A protein has these predicted regions:
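P-type ATPase nucleotide-binding
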Residues: 359-497, 506, 515-534
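N-terminal membrane topogenic signal
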Residues: 28-43, 264
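Membrane-embedded transport module
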Residues: 541-544, 581, 586-658
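Conserved ATP-binding TGD loop and adjacent catalytic N/P-domain core of P-type ATPases
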Residues: 431, 465-609
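Actuator/coupling domain of P-type ATPases
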Residues: 51, 55, 59-147, 151, ...
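Conserved catalytic phosphorylation-site environment of P-type ATPases
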Residues: 93, 97, 146, 197, ...
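Histidine-centered metal-binding segments
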Residues: 1-32
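Bilayer-spanning, highly hydrophobic alpha-helical transmembrane segments
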Residues: 43-46, 255-284, 297-315, 608-637
Length: 658
């Protein structure tokens, strides 16, 4: 990771999946059958009803309630003992054990059983909710095909594990099946369902020679793919790894609740002890039973699980909702960060535009005799060494005129190609030294271009040959269809300012900004210039919110690292950019940035609401219990009810997709 990356990657692995107060909820991946979890509660409930309605042992009224207590009480007694043995005395199990034993001691047998019964019911539903949220997050594992069909040189088919397929192998994918590994499409143009990766419902057409990502579904026909990279480095595996890691990267709210619970639990136990002891002592040793009962009510309602379960559950839910839309947050902390965004900065090419350039006009300088077609071929020979969209367009244009590697008679090969970062390339072609790129590249080598403009095309590639200006190539690029809507949605969400940073010429960037409704633009920027502009923007809005940068992953890693929240657009972006980014948008739809902000804001609002709701109800019942206005029944129902209500609230998080 870039050492300039100021983002906080807070990991917290203690009490994973539990409360932080010692509340280790049982939502392992291999959950027990439902009947096994419900049976002890059903037995306890039946015996409790028998004890209340028609106790068969009037001489020993406590006996039936002890029997009712055991099915739900023994597991909690065991958990309490295990936590105490680990040195964690102040945990929710200790609270429940103290409260119920105290209730038995003062003869409140039905309440003692009811406390653990309702507590167990609440735990059951909380565990199921957490388990469901975890399954949502881990559902991408189901996208992984179990086998791949490898085609050998003789055309024979062999079913093997995707992990066993080697780079260069040819695999076959049947219609309706998922592509198991990243590769190059060998079949003619085919359609693929990419919804599982990008969240986009529209099928995507891919041409022969273009890349196909693992996890896509072939539509309508059998296709063959040449494997580009091993399974461990495939797009699907990268997505699964990011989503699984996100579940363990805690938000600030989650870590605060964990720390709060560690202090809160011993404090409420101490307060309960004071309620039980101080008033009777001040009254001359009378009223012990009354004040002990009030202390027990205080203990029961004080259990912090409504907070310590619902808060991480809300972040699990937010990450899960986003992942189904092809928006991959690398942790709950970034849900918080996007909720506080006030400025969004975009790269231009490949992010707000399609990045699919088309060569429009090739112009030779006066006195250059090689001709436009030959100049294009020579420039393409150098540009073959680059992966930039402009370079690919020039190569494609030259190839369409017969300059292909398969046509050795007409193909040109460049030697000694070197990149001058942010400016272009230099190399030797057919004995000529070529400089290819921005006008600034040629000017840096003492060549005057005159910055000749043309009315066609948005982007200019200048060429110098043997120390002289040779000509230029004009290329056109189009805004993405969703870009204007994406900018409009950001403004509607209250984003104060949008901005474009680009290395393209001013006229092209200004035209795009005006077309899309972007507030601010900066052009002719080198990579370090983008970083400087990002620093300036962050300083300007330091007191008003956070700044996001959205890039397609090509040469964007430094500015992604400088931003408060980095969005990598398109899951096929560079590894460095995807590694540096905090949020990866699998599709090329800029409107997904607005969706991410909506999910982040709804998650944050829900967390705040749940915290206020839980604390408000608990404090009210604590005071009522201490003053004698709340019973153990009220305490346990309030505790269980608020916990389940907070859990249910987490399912209010929706995508807000438009």
């Amino acid at each position: 990771m870039c050492n300039k990356h100021h983002h906080e990657h807070g990991h917290c692995h203690d009490n994973e999946g539990g409360c932080g107060c010692g509340c280790h909820h049982h939502h392992e991946e291999n959950e027990a059958p439902m009947w096994r979890a419900l049976l002890p509660m059903a037995v306890a409930a039946l015996l409790l009803i028998v004890g209340i309605v028609a106790n068969p042992l009037p001489a020993w009224p406590w006996a039936v309630f002890v029997l009712a207590y055991l099915p739900v009480g023994l597991p909690i007694l065991k958990e309490a003992g295990e936590e105490i043995a680990k040195g964690d005395i102040f945990n929710e199990f200790t609270l429940m054990v103290l409260a119920t034993i105290g209730a038995f001691a003062i003869g409140e047998y039905p309440e003692a059983v009811a406390v653990l019964l309702f507590y167990s019911v609440g735990e059951y539903f909380q565990d199921r909710a957490v388990g469901r949220a975890r399954r949502d997050i881990q559902s991408l594992v189901n996208l992984r095909p179990d086998t791949a069909i490898v085609i050998d040189h003789d055309g024979r088919r062999t079913n093997v594990k995707p992990e066993a397929v080697e780079v260069g192998n040819v695999i076959e994918v049947v219609a309706g099946e998922r592509v198991p590994l990243d590769g190059t499409l060998l079949t003619e143009r085919a359609d693929f369902d990419t919804a599982a990766l990008t969240g986009e419902a529209e099928p995507r057409s891919i041409d022969a020679g273009d890349e196909v990502a693992a996890g896509m579904i072939a539509i309508g026909r059998v296709v063959r793919v040449r494997v580009l990279r091993p399974y461990a480095k495939s797009a699907l595996q990268r997505i699964m790894t990011m989503v699984e890691d996100a579940a363990s990267r805690k938000s600030h709210a989650e870590m605060f609740i964990r720390r709060f619970a560690r202090v809160y639990t011993p404090v409420v136990i101490a307060l309960a002890a004071l309620i039980a002891l101080v008033p009777p002592l001040l009254a001359g040793g009378t009223g012990w039973a009354v004040w002990l009962y009030r202390a027990l009510v205080f203990l029961v309602i004080s259990c912090p699980c409504a907070l310590v379960v619902s808060v991480p559950l809300a972040y699990f839910r937010g990450i899960g909702v986003a992942s189904r839309m092809g928006i991959l947050f690398k942790g709950g902390n970034y849900l918080d960060a996007v909720a506080r965004l006030s400025h969004v900065v975009f790269d231009k090419t490949g992010t707000l535009t399609t990045g699919q350039f088309v060569v429009g006009q090739v112009t030779c300088a006066e006195g250059v005799t090689v001709g436009a077609d030959n100049l294009l071929r020579m420039v393409a020979a150098v540009e073959r060494q680059s992966t930039h969209p402009v370079a690919r367009a020039i190569v494609a244009a030259a190839d369409s005129k017969g300059n292909t590697q398969a046509n050795a008679a007409s193909a040109l090969v460049a030697d000694m190609v070197e990149e001058e970062p942010g400016l272009g390339l230099r190399g030797m072609v057919a004995g000529h030294e070529l400089l290819v790129g921005k006008a600034a590249l040629l000017e840096a080598h003492g060549i005057d271009t005159g910055k000749t403009e043309t009315t066609t095309g948005d982007t200019m590639v200048y060429c110098g040959m043997d120390g002289h200006y040779a000509g230029m190539i004009a290329l056109g690029d189009q805004p993405r269809p969703e870009a204007a809507k994406g900018i409009e949605r950001l403004h509607a969400l209250g984003i104060k300012r949008t901005c474009v940073l680009s290395g393209d010429r001013s006229a092209a960037v200004e035209r795009l900004a005006q077309t899309l409704g972007v507030d601010e633009w900066h052009a002719d920027l080198l990579p370090e210039g983008k970083v400087e502009q990002m620093q300036r923007i962050k300083q300007q809005c330091a007191d008003t919110g956070k700044v996001a940068f959205v890039g397609d992953g090509i040469n964007d890693a430094p500015v992604l690292a400088m931003s408060d929240v980095g969005f990598a657009m398109g899951g096929a972006g560079s590894d460095a950019a995807v590694e540096t980014a905090d949020v990866v948008i699998q599709s090329d739809n800029p409107s997904r940035v607005a969706d991410a902000i909506i999910i982040g804001r709804r998650t944050r609002s829900l967390v705040r609401y749940n915290i206020a709701l839980a604390l408000g109800i608990k404090v009210a019942v604590m005071l009522a219990g201490a003053l004698g206005y709340a019973s153990l029944w009220a305490a346990v129902l309030a505790d269980t009810g608020v916990a389940l209500l907070c859990v249910a609230n987490t399912y209010a998080i929706r995508s807000g997709r438009r």
